[in-house]
């Protein structure tokens, strides 16, 4: 198994975001954290920033949605340039998370589920077929 490197844009200097993206050009992915202030206490970057980053790099962009009801936004993130979109299993009902994953796949993108640190690993079991 090979190790993949995905530096997070969240650690970049936003005044120099283009240069920050270019500085990680040898990485395997660009990691893009999205926080809504509800699912997690912080608020971060969104779709317009993703669109700008997509213009600056050919690297695959891994979008980590830390938002409530992610199925409302997965189409927009896919259209904005995401190559891989991950949703938290805790962010909605299992049916809605399945819907989000189906929408991501319908856009031809890779999909995944992620867990908060205190969530039991078994919580991903209903999603393994995705």
Q: What are the roles of these predicted feature ranges?
A:
Residues 1-7:
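Generic N-terminal amphipathic, Lys/Arg-enriched alpha-helix
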Residues 6, 29-31, 62, 84-86, ...:
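Conserved beta-strand positions in the central sheet of alpha/beta enzyme cores
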Residues 23-26, 79, 128-130:
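Alpha-helix termination/capping residues and helix-transition junctions
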Residues 30-45, 91:
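Glycine-rich, proline-tolerant flexible connector loops at the mouths of alpha/beta enzymes
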Residues 2, 13-16, 56, 73, ...:
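Conserved anion-binding
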Residues 17, 24, 32-33, 77:
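Conserved, mostly hydrophobic/aromatic
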Residues 38-70, 74:
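A short alpha/beta connector and helix-capping loop motif
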Residues 8-20, 35:
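N-terminal beta1-alpha1 ligand-phosphate binding loop
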């Amino acid at each position: 198994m090979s190790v993949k490197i995905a530096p997070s844009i969240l650690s970049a200097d936003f005044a120099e975001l283009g240069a920050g993206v270019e500085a990680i050009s040898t990485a395997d992915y660009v990691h893009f954290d999205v926080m809504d202030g509800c699912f997690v206490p912080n608020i971060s970057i969104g779709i317009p920033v993703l669109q700008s980053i997509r213009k600056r790099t050919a690297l695959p962009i891994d979008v980590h949605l830390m938002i409530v009801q992610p199925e409302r936004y997965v189409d927009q993130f896919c259209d904005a340039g995401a190559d891989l979109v991950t949703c938290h299993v805790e962010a909605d009902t299992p049916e809605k998370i399945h819907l989000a994953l189906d929408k991501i796949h319908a856009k031809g993108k890779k999909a995944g589920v992620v867990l908060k640190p205190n969530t039991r690993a078994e919580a991903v079991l209903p999603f393994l077929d995705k």
